[in-house]
Amino acid sequence: MKRRLVLTVFFACIAMFAAILPSFASAQSAPAAEKQKIEALIKQVGDLKHAKFFRNGWTYEPATAVRFLRGKWEANDAEVKTARDFIDKVASASGTSGKPYLIRFKDGREIKSQEFLLAELKKIEPKL
């Protein structure tokens, strides 16, 4: 009898969790159109050949910066609803030190990643 009660409660909990999971997941992630913009921004970072990315005093190649941004986006998925959220909450500054991420181009120019990504967002929004 006790085992039956435990199993009943267990399966009721699973059923309840399964019922709320889809709505929870959809409420947590960005809409498809915004995800498309974020993916386009990340692609722009990856396409910056010969550029260097600076984060907390360390230098990274574009491919490494892309992997980092994807991981940080995934970790902060619940907070990122728009491409602008991605720029502001993920791709602009270190959550640890607060220091801005920087991009140094081949010609030596340096820009904050936030400025670069906002400019890129203005270019891609009309296309998407």
Predicted regions, residues:
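N-terminal targeting signals for Sec/Tat export/insertion, comprising classic cleavable signal peptides
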Residues: 36-60
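Residue-level detector of functional hotspots within protein domains
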Residues: 31, 37-39, 87-89
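Compact alpha-helical subdomains of small soluble proteins
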Residues: 52, 56-128
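Boundary at the C-terminal end of the N-terminal hydrophobic targeting segment
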Residues: 23-32
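Positively charged n-region of N-terminal signal peptides that target proteins for export
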Residues: 1-4
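Bacterial N-terminal signal peptides
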Residues: 9-20
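Aromatic-acidic/polar surface patches that form glycan- and anion
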Residues: 6, 34
